[in-house]
């Protein structure tokens, strides 16, 4: 009868909770029975118009038992394995009746209730239910209303990999694999098991849940299985399919040493099994895997395909507007499939598609469209473009994919122990600030994540995977975690038991321990990325030893804001008796690991992308094997049947950022015939040769400065050091005081002070990343502008203080921002260099006027270059003109967009400091 009554609960009478990625619905009538709980206080405060779910940064698997108790006021039998973690949740949520029940259970006054189906519903829920819920991004209209319903975990395949990715009603095992592991062991990915591909990760379907042990071995070269492991036959069968000799031998060795068989009964490897090594197997190009994946789907699921590229044209990506891409983007934050990494692979891609049948026709059309002759964007790009800034607070909800599992937590939790995100061997951003890939065991990471949340270890009472867990702890390189494991009583008992069984020391028992008191924070946060947002809830300070009847708590909710500016202000509290870690500054000081560079850019992890400056000439043969030694016209003939009419005009325009060391100024390069041009990073690079510079015949041989005596520095010292773009691991190197108490060097000028000649701004701000999810950022910017009065005429909008902002995202890619900054620096530097060198005021005025007219689009980039190089002291030759013209024409639109974003940043109060230099005052008569 109870369930029958529950079936009549309307959607409006249900409260929805997202607990670490598990979704739960509780009827108002049930939750109202616990009026003192934080769940009721926060949920009942929601208005009917809000229709929001609450996010709780806690273990969703354990919350299943809380959810069951809310329905039945009983404890399920399966909860006995994790009573300590359940007690922690009940205490934090202020569920006093549940705390009393747990106390009675310890005293033998309460009996556990055996449930008929004590399994996560995520393992058996209808796909139709999931499909509807996911596509509309809001709670289902028909939530399951049964005490046996223990929560919906948005878990692949019932989340990430259902239709259209998979059309099946059966459970499918899956695994996230870093692409560097796939490159090392190509047999892991086949045409049949590949589910999706991103720039850093491949998602594959597995035959069994034991596949995680295979991946663990390939990562650590150790077979680490649970105690009394009984599925060795299933594991061995999966290993034989992969044919990786080292893996095969390791499993055979394990069987022999665990008593499953003896050396005399274990048959030797057959000649065809495991005979080849992974290194000898050819690694498939990305485009073969990506395109082979797409052609499995109907055109209706793909929608309109399009191909995107980096500015140099070497890296190609394919995406579309169909339901398939929309579905993946909702989960991974990106839906671009990588195709190529070098110019030579673009040739190979064309040849590959030429041999494909009509199934690949939509892809051919997309590539043909991409390769058609295009002109650069018009200079006046701001008419059809809107500057946007996304603010990421510490309460940003991050989806973390680990092996065969995924979790949801907050950015603040991940930043508590910066060693996690500072570990490039294990951590990869799929989409910066949204989805994170961790190269580890998914089941073990659940316990690691609980430690990050609570500051202490909570392991099941019958935990059996100590060797694997110890290995995982060591590889995360978190001293506090290692210390917590060393102090764990269950771990001590296990080591003593193993020592008594075997005198050989287990290397995994030797942990590197650094004494450090763990901290504990609990937050409920709003998910700013979902259509259905989450309201923040915070736990009140309490102690592990606080009696349940004395524990109290209050909830703090943030005000409603525009969707573009949603953020939360956390109230940081301690739930454990251990104090916060000594020397633990603000959350912001832990940001160094937020953007660990996964090695995309060669040997210099802090440098911009290194791209080959290669010019594709239609009439010349390549002298190297990369690209292929065939005429370009022959390549074009391969795609002639694709109706490429103007193929003779088809050429790539590489734009390269190279660097000899991480601390040197980046050099931008542009194609001109078969040569590359240096970036005009300073005006000296374009002035006349000095005698000393002629001794260096390199690309920058003409970069000698003029032979003038420098005069006194201007009042404003331009902030133009050889500043490198940083990776997030550098964040913690900044001084905490500078972050918490930023002081502007100079106030913004009054509008009356700003003349029409322009202003140079130096702006320091929270880390700014691109909209493409790339893991690089800028923390300071030099901006040339003529529109400072716009900032004075605009009232700053309500905005979080910089201390509450972890990072920002502009509506530009990181590559576009990189070149935009260089253009701003170039314009500022040619002006300030003229002032520093005490040029005649007529020359300085000419330079200032040219920059102003270029910025306001009163002259073209070509005319700007001609007039600039005609000024005395600049190198004026045809080669220099063409190089500089190409560079300005390409970078100026990006600079104008970046300047507009920076204006918006200042207006919203997101800058840390702003200083300026008014150019007109340098031209005044003495």
From Swiss-Prot:
Record keyword Repeat present: yes
Superkingdom of source: Eukaryota
Subcellular localization: Nucleus
GO term, biological process aspect, one: spermatogenesis
InterPro entries: SKP1/BTB/POZ_sf, T1-type_BTB
Residue ranges annotated for the BTB domain, each copy included: 18-72, 398-485
Region feature (Disordered): 673-751
GO cellular component: nucleus
Gene3D superfamilies in UniProt: Potassium Channel Kv1.1, Chain A
Pfam families for the chain: BTB_2 (PF02214)
Function, in words: Transcription regulator which is essential for male fertility and for the completion of meiotic prophase in spermatocytes. Regulates progression of the pachytene stage of meiotic prophase and promotes the transcriptional activation activity ZNF541. Required for the organization of chromosomes during metaphase I.
Name the UniProt record assigns to this protein: BTB/POZ domain-containing protein KCTD19
């Amino acid at each position: 009868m109870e369930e029958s009554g529950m079936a009549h609960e309307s959607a409006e009478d249900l409260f929805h909770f997202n607990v670490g990625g598990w979704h739960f619905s509780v009827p108002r009538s049930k939750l109202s029975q616990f009026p003192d709980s934080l769940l009721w206080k926060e949920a009942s405060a929601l208005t009917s118009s809000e229709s929001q779910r609450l996010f709780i940064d806690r273990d969703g698997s354990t919350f299943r038992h809380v959810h069951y108790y809310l329905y039945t006021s009983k404890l399920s039998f399966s909860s006995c394995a994790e009573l300590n973690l359940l007690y922690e949740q009940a205490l934090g949520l202020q569920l006093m009746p549940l705390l009393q029940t747990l106390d009675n259970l310890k005293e033998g006054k309460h009996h556990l209730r055996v449930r008929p189906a004590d399994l996560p519903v995520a393992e058996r829920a209808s796909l139709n239910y999931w499909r509807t819920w996911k596509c509309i991004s809001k709670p289902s209209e028909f939530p399951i209303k049964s005490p046996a319903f223990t929560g919906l975990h948005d878990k692949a395949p019932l989340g990430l990999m259902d239709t259209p990715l998979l059309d099946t009603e059966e459970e499918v095992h899956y695994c996230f694999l870093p692409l560097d592991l796939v490159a090392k062991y190509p047999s892991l990915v086949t045409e049949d098991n590949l589910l999706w591909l991103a720039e850093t990760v491949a998602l594959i379907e597995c035959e069994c849940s034991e596949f995680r042990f295979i991946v663990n071995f390939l990562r650590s070269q150790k077979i680490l299985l649970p105690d009394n492991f009984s599925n060795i036959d299933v594991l061995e069968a999966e290993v034989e399919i992969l044919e990786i000799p080292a893996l095969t031998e390791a499993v055979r060795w394990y069987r022999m040493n665990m008593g499953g068989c003896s050396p005399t009964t274990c048959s030797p490897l057959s000649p065809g099994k495991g005979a080849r090594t992974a290194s000898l197997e050819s690694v498939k190009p990305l485009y073969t895997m990506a395109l082979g994946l797409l052609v499995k789907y109907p055109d209706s699921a793909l929608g309109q395909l399009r191909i995107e590229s980096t500015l140099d044209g070497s890296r190609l990506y394919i995406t579309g507007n169909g339901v398939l891409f929309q579905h993946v983007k909702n989960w991974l934050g990106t839906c671009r499939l990588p195709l190529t990494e070098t110019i030579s692979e673009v040739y190979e891609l064309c040849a590959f598609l030429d041999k494909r049948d009509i199934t690949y026709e939509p892809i051919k059309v997309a590539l043909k469209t991409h390769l058609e002759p295009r002109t650069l964007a018009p200079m006046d790009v701001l008419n059809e473009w809107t500057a946007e800034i996304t603010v990421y607070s510490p309460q940003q909800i991050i989806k973390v994919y680990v092996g065969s599992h995924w979790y949801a937590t907050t950015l603040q939790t991940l930043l508590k122990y910066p060693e996690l995100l500072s570990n490039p061997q294990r951590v990869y951003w799929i989409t910066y600030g949204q989805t994170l890939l961790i190269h580890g065991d998914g089941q073990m990471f659940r316990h690691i994540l609980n430690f990050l949340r609570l500051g202490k270890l909570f392991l099941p009472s019958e935990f059996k995977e100590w060797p694997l867990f110890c290995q995982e702890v060591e590889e995360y390189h978190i001293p506090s975690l290692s210390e917590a494991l060393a102090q764990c009583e269950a771990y001590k008992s296990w080591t003593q038991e193993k020592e008594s069984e075997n005198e050989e020391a287990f290397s995994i028992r030797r942990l590197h321990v650094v004494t450090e008191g763990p901290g504990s924070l609990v937050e409920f946060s709003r998910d700013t990325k979902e259509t259905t947002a989450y309201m923040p809830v915070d736990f009140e300070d309490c102690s592990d030893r606080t009696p349940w009847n004395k524990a109290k708590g209050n909830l703090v909710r943030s005000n409603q804001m525009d969707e573009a500016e949603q953020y939360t202000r956390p109230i940081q509290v301690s739930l454990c008796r251990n104090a916060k870690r000594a020397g633990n500054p603000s959350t912001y000081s832990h940001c160094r690991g937020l953007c660990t560079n996964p090695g995309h850019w060669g040997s210099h992890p802090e440098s911009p992308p290194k791209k080959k400056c290669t010019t594709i000439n239609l009439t010349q043969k390549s002298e190297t094997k990369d690209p292929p030694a065939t005429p370009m016209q022959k390549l074009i003939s391969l795609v002639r049947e694709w109706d490429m009419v103007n193929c003779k005009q088809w050429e790539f325009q590489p734009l390269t950022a190279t660097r000899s060391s991480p601390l040197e100024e980046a050099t931008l390069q542009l194609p001109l015939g078969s040569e590359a041009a240096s970036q005009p990073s300073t005006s000296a690079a374009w002035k006349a040769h000095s005698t000393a510079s002629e001794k260096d015949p390199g690309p920058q041989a003409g970069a000698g400065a003029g032979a003038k005596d420098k005069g006194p520095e201007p009042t404003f010292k331009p902030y133009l050091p050889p500043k490198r773009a940083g990776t997030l691991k550098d964040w913690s190197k900044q001084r905490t005081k500078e972050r918490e108490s930023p002081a502007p060097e100079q106030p913004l000028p009054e509008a009356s002070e700003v003349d029409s000649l322009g202003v140079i701004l130096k702006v320091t701000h929270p880390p700014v990343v691109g909209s493409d999810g790339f893991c690089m950022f800028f923390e300071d910017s030099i901006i040339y502008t003529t529109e400072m009065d716009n900032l004075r005429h605009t009232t700053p909008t309500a905005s979080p203080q910089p201390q509450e902002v972890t990072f920002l995202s502009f509506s530009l890619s990181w590559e576009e921002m990189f070149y935009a900054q260089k253009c701003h620096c170039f314009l500022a530097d040619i002006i300030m260099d003229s002032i520093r060198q005490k040029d005649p005021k007529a020359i300085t005025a000419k330079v200032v006027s040219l920059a102003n007219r270029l910025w306001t689009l009163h002259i073209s980039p070509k005319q700007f270059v001609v007039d600039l190089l005609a000024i005395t002291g600049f190198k004026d030759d045809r080669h220099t003109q063409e190089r500089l013209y190409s560079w300005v024409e390409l970078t100026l639109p990006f600079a104008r967009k970046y300047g507009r974003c920076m204006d918006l940043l200042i207006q919203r109060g997101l800058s840390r400091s702003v200083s300026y230099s008014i150019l007109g005052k340098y031209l005044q008569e003495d």
